[in-house]
Design a protein with these regions (language model features):
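Ordered core of a single globular domain
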Residues: 436-440
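N-terminal targeting leaders characterized by basic, low-complexity, disordered sequences
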Residues: 1-60
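Structural boundary/hinge residues at secondary-structure and domain interfaces
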Residues: 62-216, 261-310, 326-435, 446-488, ...
Length: 605
């Protein structure tokens, strides 16, 4: 409006001026003036737009806030309803699709370990498992059901299927009054408790009685069965089941509510074939002696206990994948004992570059970064911050160093600096026999070669390798006595050139056996086979090695990207008589401040 008013005012003044100069009609004068004025205004507008395009100005906006009480209340109501829906959905999922863990009913201060097996034959984890093992009838669904029939004494379809739920297993606990006693509890989810009770009562070998508000089915043979929520509990003695029922009525913390179990459970997949939990703080000698692998070994369990206590707890899950099995574990360390230690967490990124010197048909490979840090980590865990333990361990290492390499070689000054970078151990096949190779990436090639030569020379000079010989002595009365003595083996140092690389051998006695080493690029290779060293030199040249093999691509690469160290074992070749359907295992470990995460892939033959 302001712009139009100004134009009209100017027009009136110009009309008066024009009328004075010439006697044109007032309407014509007005028409011409307005036409000219609008042209001028349009030109000015165009100029302003051009100027504005060169110097754009930011427009200021005033945001007017308005609050609508009804909308706010409605939004809050939606948020509340959504929270309720999510919570209800989670609880429904927990109840309907995922069985409650037995950990909820176990005392945290007495439970040593438990293992849970998925017993839902319609679950995709079990269907995948049976598909992977279809060539092994002894691991079929039918065989598993036959095993259940044998253990539970009943027909699967008629007696067990009508009540058996999705979870079953065994628990190991310390005795309530005597920690040296080992209590064993079997459990199975009863998806239909009425059918489960009918199954027990039909046996007519159990008498029903009351204890602590629970029904107990007791047999004359000492066996006892009780129900805790949806679980059937079975023990071979009355006191064990009574102790567990007493715990249900107490205010004591369960394993499920403990921090260590939560740390492990949160790192485990929801769907799995089986799950193992171990609380190392509660491990007893009685439990260790129950482990088949340790049962027949001459082990001083008292000396083993301090190391076990540092480990805190471990969880391990078996998962069936489309083409293999996976074992995922989370080993938690005792935070109070390792919180000040700086070597627990691995900082270096491991690439497994040493695999280019290893045969593509290797029987086994284990590699990582910074073995110096590994040793220090192990010492820190054992010592729990006690300097005296560290000093004693250093003395032990130095004593062994002096035994084989003499007093001139100092473990911390000469050997430890060689162990800072990448390392690997490999087992290869040579003429049907296994040979061993150890690899070290050198930091300072010139300096490190001198140290290796010093160690080799001292080993050749000192010996440290003995053989047993029988020496006869004639006594004064003419009696001949025999004595077994340890005689040092003669060690001969020899060198040979192969493709421009010097291979040094330390041959023991008159035989060809011994130790051989060479430096390829910046990698030191030590082996018990001369031909093994030559083979590693050839592998680097012809590019036919583990690094570029299908084995590396399919089995090692998947675990390498998230691992501080890796391992690979060809069980079919390494242990051909092993009665397992697994042909190869590849795995990796990832170190954190409070624990170690491991993933291992099990490949079916």
């Amino acid at each position: 409006m302001g712009k139009k008013a100004n134009i009209k005012k100017i027009v009136r003044e110009l009309i008066k001026e024009k009328e004075g100069k010439d006697k044109k009609d007032k309407r014509k004068i007005k028409k011409e003036l307005i036409k000219g004025m609008w042209r001028e205004e349009q030109v000015k507008e165009k100029d302003k737009k051009k100027e504005a395009s060169h110097h754009p100005k930011k427009e200021k906006f005033k945001i007017k806030l308005s609050f609508n009480g009804k909308k706010i209340f409605g939004g809050a109501l939606v948020a509340i309803m959504l929270s309720i829906l999510i919570t209800t959905g989670y609880l429904l999922f927990e109840k309907v699709f995922k069985p409650i863990s037995i950990a909820k009913y176990l005392p945290s201060d007495r439970t040593i370990a438990f293992v849970e097996f998925n017993s839902n034959f319609n679950h995709n984890q079990l269907t995948k498992s049976f598909e992977l093992l279809q060539d092994y009838p002894e691991y079929s669904e039918k065989k598993v059901q036959e095993l259940l029939e044998q253990k539970l004494v009943g027909n699967y379809d008629a007696d067990l299927k009508v009540w058996l739920g999705r979870n079953m297993g065994v628990v190991f606990m310390k005795g309530k009054s005597d920690g040296k006693i080992l209590e064993k509890i079997y459990f199975a989810e009863a998806i239909n408790k009425s059918n489960a009770k009918r199954f027990i009562e039909n046996k007519k070998t159990y008498a029903k009685m009351e204890y602590a508000g629970y029904e107990i089915y007791a047999a004359e043979t000492g066996e006892n069965i009780a129900f805790i929520d949806s679980y059937l509990i079975y023990t071979k003695d009355k006191k064990t089941i009574e102790n567990l029922l007493d715990f249900q009525n107490s205010e004591n913390k369960s394993v499920f509510l403990s921090e260590k179990y939560s740390r492990i459970s949160n790192n485990m997949p929801i769907n799995k074939v089986a799950f193992l939990y171990v609380n190392f703080n509660e491990v007893s000698e009685a439990f260790l002696k129950k482990i088949p692998l340790l049962r027949n070994m001459d082990i001083n369990f008292q000396q083993l206990m301090p190391l076990i206590k540092v480990l805190d707890s471990d969880g391990m899950a078996l998962i069936a994948m489309n083409d293999k099995f996976a074992v995922q574990s989370f080993l938690t360390l005792n935070v109070d004992k390792v919180k000040e230690e700086k070597y627990i967490n691995m900082k270096e990124k491991y690439s497994a570059s040493i695999t280019q010197y290893v045969s593509e048909n290797a029987l086994a490979f284990y590699g990582g970064q910074n073995i110096e840090g590994q040793i220090k980590r192990f010492i820190e865990i054992l010592s729990s911050g006690k300097q005296s333990v560290v000093e004693n361990f250093d003395k032990i290492l130095q004593n062994y160093t002096q035994k084989y390499f003499g007093s001139e070689v100092i473990f911390n000054l000469d050997i430890m600096p060689l162990l800072k970078n990448e390392y690997a151990l490999a087992i290869e096949n040579e003429g049907g026999k296994p040979i061993y190779k150890f690899f070290l990436e050198l930091s300072d090639k010139k300096k490190d070669i001198q140290i290796l030569e010093k160690i080799a020379n001292n080993f050749a000079k000192i010996g440290g390798v003995y053989k047993q010989e029988v020496i006869e002595h004639t006594l004064p009365d003419g009696t001949v006595s025999k004595e077994i003595v340890a005689v040092p083996e003669a060690i001969k140092k020899e060198s040979e050139d192969y493709k421009g690389i010097k291979i040094t051998g330390l041959k023991i006695g008159g035989e060809s056996k011994g130790f051989f080493y060479a430096i390829i690029d910046n990698i030191a290779i030590i082996s018990d086979s001369f031909n093994g060293i030559k083979n590693s030199i050839d592998l680097k040249e012809n590019k036919s090695n583990l690094k570029v093999s299908d084995t590396f691509l399919k089995l090692i690469t998947p675990v390498l990207k998230n691992s501080d160290e890796i391992s690979y074992f060809n069980l079919a070749k390494l242990l051909p008589n092993l009665p397992l359907p697994i042909s190869e295992i590849s795995g990796g470990n990832n170190y954190f401040d409070d624990g170690i995460v491991s993933i291992n892939y099990l490949h079916v033959k």
